Amino acid sequence: MLEKLSFLLHKFPLVSKCGFIKKLASESSNDSNIIRIPDFPGGAEGFELVIKFCYDISFEINTENIAMLLCAAEYLEMTEEHSVENLVETIEVYLNEVILKSLSKSVKVLQKSQDLLPIAERVRLVDRCIDSIAYAICQESQSNEDIVDWWADDLAVLKIDMFRRVLVAMIARGFKRYSLGPVLKLYAEKALRGLDIFGKEAKKMEAEQEHEKRLILETIVSLLPRERNSVSVSFLSILLRAAIYLETTVACRLDLEKRMGLQLRQAVIDDLLIPYYSFNGDNTMLDVDTVQRILMNYLEFEVEGNSADFASDIGELMETYLAEIASDRNINFAKFIGFAECIPKQSRMYRAIDIFLKTHPNISEVEKKKVCSLMDCKKLSRDVYAHAAQNDRFQENLSNSDSPAPATAEKTLSPPELSSYKNELSKLNRENQYLKLELLKVKMKFKELEKEKAFEVMSGSDCSSSVSTASVAKPRLPRKSFINSVSQKLGKLINPFGLKQGQTKQPKSRRHSIS
């Protein structure tokens, strides 16, 4: 009897070839014809193949059943001690001559062995398959320096523990560790498929499945080569998103952050847009703390205090990221300031600060001044500084600046010209405010006329003649006076910097944000 199935068999064919059954038969009472076999490897399917062998019924040994057959034969002690050319010897010949000489077949048998543990370990089937795979891959890599993906794709069918053991065996045989990057990437893409690491929705997986994927991810990270640039920063970013999403160990996440910091020069903005995975109701869009730690790793290991290197390498990238988080209405003042202060002041942050002030209009004046103090006006171009001078959100802070003029202007203008430049900026600002006021008056007058006309229409047909007379007598909208006023003001601005005849100047944008 096997599991819940009963097999009606003659004892002699089994006893003559199976030492285990012979022992059970001798120990059972003479009156009992039932032999129970517990925990049989391969189950009923494996036992049926053993029966065929004992009854000399032909069947095929192949990659699908050889692992099950070997474990069953070893369990039943079908060795040469009990019968010549017994099942164990037959399987060993096929295993050595066919299976272990083929990489793909060895991987297939190893995959089947995963469901036959621990007996597959005891008969050394797992170790022999792993050693065969490692040897074949090392031979392949020596003959072809370009790593072939086909064998990496074969390894992706293995469970993470077997996959790890194969890679360790490959390294022990001389495989170059930095070449493991593409293999790990391919395995991660298949094993971690289905994770919603680009969204912020609640997890939709069972606890057991989450634990399995967490174990896979932590193992992959532990196998990553230590050599810089052995894997892309984009792949590291995906692993980090998954690590945060699956709530892996802190050590795993910090390792990935450190690796990204070392390769931050190759990063693009999408690599840093890591969602803030919060399942407690926090609506912040991006994980600023994680990116800040990545930046600190970069500053510690790469820049070492040289701010010029920072500006040339990733200054623009960090300014772009700062602008991204500035547009988040849910990001608080302290977090924005904390990240911005990590960026050296020579990096121009006008756009990010402008977006933050526009998105957070209710912050206090003290906080507003603190935000504006992050910007070094000396590093602004003339056009940007002129734009900031006309921006309502910056005017007061620029006027109080110790050095309001941009550094480029100081280098190209003499002191009298610089003073004239500042006066022109102030004059332009006042005139801009005056034009806004004039436009507001016209809009108010226009609204009054619309209200009067609507009232006249509602008066009915009896008042039509009087309305017509009144409308004829009513003075028209003084558009001409407004146009003349605007023309006069614009006329004053034609040559604000004392340009010579024939010189031209680019028109200045009057918008309050720079795209």
Swiss-Prot record:
Concerning InterPro entries, the annotation shows: BTB/POZ_dom, NPH3/RPT2-like, NPH3_dom, SKP1/BTB/POZ_sf
Phosphotyrosine occurs at Y350
Family matches, as Pfam families:
BTB, NPH3
The record places domain BTB at: 1-63
Q: Which residues form the NPH3 domain?
A: 149-409
One GO biological-process annotation of the entry reads: protein ubiquitination
Per the record, which residues fall in region Disordered? 395-417, 494-515
Residues folding into a coiled coil are 418-452
In terms of superkingdom, the source organism counts as Eukaryota
Q: Which keywords appear in this protein's UniProt record, sorted alphabetically?
A: Coiled coil, Phosphoprotein, Ubl conjugation pathway
Pathway the protein takes part in: Protein modification; protein ubiquitination
Similarity comment: family membership: Belongs to the NPH3 family.
Its domain comment says: The BTB/POZ domain mediates the interaction with some component of ubiquitin ligase complexes.
Q: What does this protein do?
A: May act as a substrate-specific adapter of an E3 ubiquitin-protein ligase complex (CUL3-RBX1-BTB) which mediates the ubiquitination and subsequent proteasomal degradation of target proteins.
The name this protein goes by in its record: Putative BTB/POZ domain-containing protein At3g49970
Species of origin: Arabidopsis thaliana (Mouse-ear cress)
